[in-house]
Amino acid sequence: MKNIEIDEELYQYIATNTQFIGESASAILRRLLNLGVEAKLETVTVNEPSDVVEVNILPESEEKAVKIETAEVKEPKSKAVVKVTAESHETVFNFINKEELAMQRGAVGRFLLILAALYRAHPDQFGVVTDISGRDRLYFANSENKLAESGSSTKPRQIPESPFWVITNSNTTRKKMMLTKASISLGYSDSDVEKIRELL
């Protein structure tokens, strides 16, 4: 285990993204960076200033490959920003915290947590859910107003940590159907779709 210094703002960000009591900072950062729980720790030491810092991580398998972009370092004390893009295929199950799900009082809270996990697993593809609609109204949109315009008493709620909104004034069966359609749209197998439905 290595120690690093971080500023107060980063510390607060990590602390607010804790999903359960006892979760380590490493686990939180792995989740936020989409590195998964099995990623190897890599240490880079720079003793002298250089123009470019390059980090290479050799993946154990193609599925766990990680792309690293380099950043220029202009002064020895300046901070280099390294953007890490995970290429592994994350699933909603990597982001579901069953303890937090169980603590929700009602179906709406569980529904929003499951949708938030789907968004975190597939942030780039999640927009496909805005095509899911009922006979007379939209179920998902990228603004509260769009959902309000599509019908009365929709009770739009923002999906946590995402730019998307969903209607919540529907029964549990309808919510399960919405989760089913969203999961199918995001490419889940029939068995995984059923597991996602049952989380509600």
Curated annotation (Swiss-Prot):
GO molecular function, one term: DNA binding
Protein source organism: Colwellia psychrerythraea (strain 34H / ATCC BAA-681)
CC per GO annotation: cytoplasm
Family classification: Belongs to the SeqA family.
Keyword ATP-binding among record annotations: no
Name of this chain's protein: Negative modulator of initiation of replication
Keyword annotations of the record: Cytoplasm, DNA replication inhibitor, DNA-binding
InterPro entries cross-referenced by the UniProt entry: Arc_rbn_hlx_hlx (IPR013321), Ribbon_hlx_hlx (IPR010985), SeqA (IPR005621), SeqA_DNA-bd_C (IPR026577), SeqA_DNA-bd_C_sf (IPR036835), SeqA_N (IPR033761)
Localization (cell): Cytoplasm
Highest taxon listed in the record's lineage: Bacteria
Stretches the record annotates as Interaction with DNA: 107-108
Gene Ontology biological process terms from the UniProt entry: negative regulation of DNA-templated DNA replication initiation; regulation of DNA-templated transcription
Main localization of the protein described in the UniProt heading: cytoplasm
Role, per record: Negative regulator of replication initiation, which contributes to regulation of DNA replication and ensures that replication initiation occurs exactly once per chromosome per cell cycle. Binds to pairs of hemimethylated GATC sequences in the oriC region, thus preventing assembly of replication proteins and re-initiation at newly replicated origins. Repression is relieved when the region becomes fully methylated.
Subunit structure: Homodimer. Polymerizes to form helical filaments.
